[in-house]
Amino acid sequence: MGHRRLEVDGVSKRYGETVALDAMTFDVHAGEIFGFVGSNGAGKTTTMRIALGVLAADAGEVRWDGAPVTHRTRNRIGYMPEERGLYPRMRAGEQLEYLARLHGLSRSEASRATRQWTERLGVASRIGDEVQKLSLGNQQRVQLAAALVHDPEILVLDEPFSGLDPVAVDVMSQVLRDKADAGVPVIFSSHQLELVERLCDRVGIVRSGAMVACGAVGELRSGGAERILVDAPQAPPGWAAGLPGVTVVGDATGPTLLELAPGADDQAVLRAALATGPVREFARRLPSLTDLFRHVVSNEHTEHTEHVEDTGGTAA
């Protein structure tokens, strides 16, 4: 099972003049959590719908385990749509059993799986309630149960964490981790970048329908410009402004955050700081995923994919 992966290869989609996807390419390996981030309208949902076969691509292909995704494969995908797709007037438990049977489980298997997932997700006491009577957080939990109830081989989740309280986020995060550990490729989109940073093995940043950066979170972060946090309490304002290759990112009050151009001498920065008096802290700071995202999304000139590693796909 080690080599199984979901591949999105050169997928394009247009709506009239609007390019929704432009040769979108990436893959998600078995046992990996892949975070899909981008502004609204960047193409995340379109990509997911094409992967599911809900939408046809104009060009390119989606493969699972080396073969094009077919109706049979799609039956093995657990999907959580962004616009939640449960029947509002159906009881939560009946809804889950119905969906499980739709995916080929027997009545007793469907009932057992429904019990297992509603207990795991903390909504077992709600299975007799109509979906529309549940709180938003509990509707989310039932929606996740709907994606899991047929024991899928692949999980595709569109904004699964939106509207969840911190406890539910922890429960859902643990479920996704457990699924990945069991060898399932998990892909989810999210606007909560600190969550993506904490949870994902790899991240793809999408802009205007194309993948603009893709790689392990640590590699993407360390691939950014080097930053140094300097706490020199007696340093006058602007003490670092004239240093070669150094940009002051922030020093409103307290420690100064500096960005170093490639090849800039951090020891020269340290000497300049020591010349002002004591230095309490002098530490390298990696940019957060939020910083990277801002940089990539606002920087319209980086049109080429920065592939930090060989993901088996070609750069878009």
Map each language-model feature to its residues.
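ABC transporter nucleotide-binding domain
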Residues: 171-260
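Structural motif
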Residues: 84, 244-247, 277
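ABC transporter nucleotide-binding domains
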Residues: 3-6, 13-207, 213
